[in-house]
Amino acid sequence: MTITPQHLIALLPLLIVGLTVVVVMLSIAWRRNHFLNATLSVIGLNAALVSLWFVGQAGAMDVTPLMRVDGFAMLYTGLVLLASLATCTFAYPWLEGYNDNQEEFYLLVLIASLGGILLTNANHLAALFLGIELISLPLFGLIGYAFRQKRSLEASIKYTILSAAASSFLLFGMALVYAQSGNLSFEALGKSLGDGMLHEPLLLAGFGLMIVGLGFKLSLVPFHLWTPDVYQGAPAPVSTFLATASKIAIFGVVMRLFLYAPVGDSEAVRVVLGIIAFASIIFGNLMALSQTNIKRLLGYSSISHLGYLLVALIALQSGEMSMEAVGVYLAGYLFSSLGAFGVVSLMSSPFRGPDADSLYSYRGLFWHRPVLAAVMTVMMLSLAGIPMTLGFIGKFYVLAVGVQASLWWLVAAVVVGSAIGLYYYLRVAVSLYLHAPQQPGRDAPTNWQYSAGGIVVLISALLVLVLGVWPQPLISLVQLAMPLM
């Protein structure tokens, strides 16, 4: 296949982030300067974000058999880049207090972003695997970045070993799918499944192993055991990336796979996915009830949020509304998570040992940082799915899709899970307004709202509220971002 200038325009975000990786690498080799390398990383990610406009003008197309650039890919690429940008912004003040090498952090985030962009454009199982590995490998280093902290090192080792096992399941599953169908392209797989091959035992075994591998990456029950420990052990900015960019990119490619290769047409696959979704929603919410560490709580809550999204994935063959539901839900989840983890990052900056992740650290926050407490309250309400926030719009969409597809038992799970979630999210929100302890622990800087991280947190809160009241611009954007069929 000949690469034309149009193809290069379609690949602009990938090329710009790749170029930024090289520039930052050379800059680190030339001179260690934290501010310079952080600025170069942020400029590169912003340029990649702006380039999406030019990609849109070029139109939808296939770039090599591995990648497809269309509205769907552009939307998810934009979300991944926003999450990466926020991660770099939150990391800067945290790294200011870090005595070891600071600059490599941005290099690892950029490489992981590259993997995320590759995943959102993937149209082939080979591209899917490459993207997942490219996003996972830098995370091994990022999670253990504060390696002098026992929890951070433990979390990194745990994630590395389990991630390697999950990747082997995924790869073996792909091998079985290829052995039965002779294809790795999503569309070619779809044609094979349309010819009645879906009920072949070897193919079902292959998809089953792929579900195990992808279930680990998305921290779905019962492949979730690493999640709370890794969220707690990783530095707060890394937990931000793990909860947002990583999940969005992987869920995006799974959506495309299920759309082109209708695996959900198999009753066995639908039942397995339904059980995983049900268990993730109920278990994730129940485990979050007893948490006193805010990062562990958000880790368990992310399990339930992926369970809600899985309901929309199961209903994918019922109509286009599922695509819309996932797009809106992921946008709401992104901004809510950026705000919540952003507050934790601000409270934990600069690096002085363990993060300010104990619920006790946030007790009475309103009385000395009222705006920060208000932002955290908005994020908790959005994650709980309270009306007038973007989280409510996403949850409403998921319920509507579940009802449309007659998935009544999963709709009941969403309702029960949301009711349980309301308790622990409100518990965090209420603690912000209690009497402050006599000896307060960690605290955000007095001028936090003037820092880049503070601005990102405030913009996230504003978007959650504005789009919660007037979601039409977001809905219109998601409706435009349909995949090329």
Swiss-Prot record:
It holds the Pfam family Proton_antipo_M. GO terms for cellular component: plasma membrane. It is found in: Cell inner membrane. It comes from the Bacteria. The keyword Cell membrane applies. InterPro entries: NADH-Q_OxRdtase_suN/2, ND/Mrp_TM. Keywords: Cell inner membrane, Cell membrane, Membrane, NAD, Quinone, Translocase, Transmembrane, Transmembrane helix, Transport, Ubiquinone. The chain crosses the membrane at residues 8-28, 35-55, 71-91, 105-125, 127-147, 159-179, 203-223, 235-255, 271-291, 297-317, 326-346, 373-393, 408-430, 455-475. It is a multi-pass membrane protein. Coiled coil: none annotated. Its EC number is 7.1.1.-. It catalyses: a quinone + NADH + 5 H(+)(in) = a quinol + NAD(+) + 4 H(+)(out). GO terms for biological process: ATP synthesis coupled electron transport. NDH-1 shuttles electrons from NADH, via FMN and iron-sulfur (Fe-S) centers, to quinones in the respiratory chain. The immediate electron acceptor for the enzyme in this species is believed to be ubiquinone. Couples the redox reaction to proton translocation (for every two electrons transferred, four hydrogen ions are translocated across the cytoplasmic membrane), and thus conserves the redox energy in a proton gradient. Belongs to the complex I subunit 2 family. This is NADH-quinone oxidoreductase subunit N. The lineage of its organism: Bacteria, Pseudomonadati, Pseudomonadota, Gammaproteobacteria, Enterobacterales.
